[in-house]
Amino acid sequence: MTIALDKFTKDENDLFDIMDDWLRRDRFVFVGWSGLLLFPCAYFAVGGWFTGTTFVTSWYTHGLASSYLEGCNFLTAAVSTPANSLAHSLLLLWGPEAQGDFTRWCQLGGLWTFVALHGAFGLIGFMLRQFELARSVQLRPYNAIAFSGPIAVFVSVFLIYPLGQSGWFFAPSFGVAAIFRFILFFQGFHNWTLNPFHMMGVAGVLGAALLCAIHGATVENTLFEDGDGANTFRAFNPTQAEETYSMVTANRFWSQIFGVAFSNKRWLHFFMLFVPVTGLWMSALGVVGLALNLRAYDFVSQEIRAAEDPEFETFYTKNILLNEGIRAWMAAQDQPHENLIFPEEVLPRGNAL
């Protein structure tokens, strides 16, 4: 029997190998296969946002001014969501709504879907970039796994929540003041602050901030080798290559402070990874629940007693009244197409909430 050697060896000029060699070449800014998704999507998302906040009005979708051209500033400009009547249309430039007319596409809110979808894929591309580089330098992929937290929050808030509602209209617009208004909307219509998933998200994010502050301060406090400057600040060198802090000293310090302390760096740093990522994932799950109009905690017994007894009031019942005021004010303003009319006696009156 004859054996053909090298029969299945790859052609040296194979197109995939040529592209792989160029994409993953060592350069100042790594490109990689993930870059084919990341860079175009990030460019279009950021470019679309700058274009919208600079030039595009929200008059036709929200009845608002939202661009620098109309007199907004950085905090009040936004790329606004499409009108509620457009439901969940992708609003493609060549679609039946805009029919290839760029000006009409902008007026209809096409830039919002453009920025949201390119932004989502850009974030996914950035996570894939971390996977790819970790693989290249033989690291574990925990950076990429951690970045799944922000991606989950973005996708749940900007895509899944409006998909569960009547249209993109109910997603946040891309702007600072617009996001603040969306937060108030979430509170008034979903009582978001009393949602256990929001509580877990707050605990995760603020807990992570506390852990970062404690960890950074502890490492700086336990440096045992510094430069030879005359005082502490001159001797401290932030670019020192060697690890010269004492885990043993840090453990002793926190054992005396709290009675317990991390005994090894692996568990400490895993905990610092686990707390914020879990918090972000929990808040994302909560927003998915809101997309389905799942309710937060309801203490109905307190509401009934407060309605029957004028002298009984709790912070919960006061917040429920506040939420009713938010709904009464925001619904008529945000959804004029619904022709909502509230009797004067149910509208909030100054401090009389």
UniProtKB/Swiss-Prot annotation:
Protein name: Photosystem II D2 protein
Primary site of residence: plastid
Catalytic activity, as annotated: 2 a plastoquinone + 4 hnu + 2 H2O = 2 a plastoquinol + O2
Binding site for chlorophyll a ChlzD2: 118
Signal peptide span: none
UniProt keyword terms in alphabetical order: Acetylation, Chlorophyll, Chloroplast, Chromophore, Electron transport, Iron, Magnesium, Membrane, Metal-binding, Oxidoreductase, Phosphoprotein, Photosynthesis, Photosystem II, Plastid, Thylakoid, Transmembrane, Transmembrane helix, Transport
Topology in the lipid bilayer: Multi-pass membrane protein
Organism: Atropa belladonna
The record's free-text note on cofactor binding: The D1/D2 heterodimer binds P680, chlorophylls that are the primary electron donor of PSII, and subsequent electron acceptors. It shares a non-heme iron and each subunit binds pheophytin, quinone, additional chlorophylls, carotenoids and lipids. There is also a Cl(-1) ion associated with D1 and D2, which is required for oxygen evolution. The PSII complex binds additional chlorophylls, carotenoids and specific lipids.
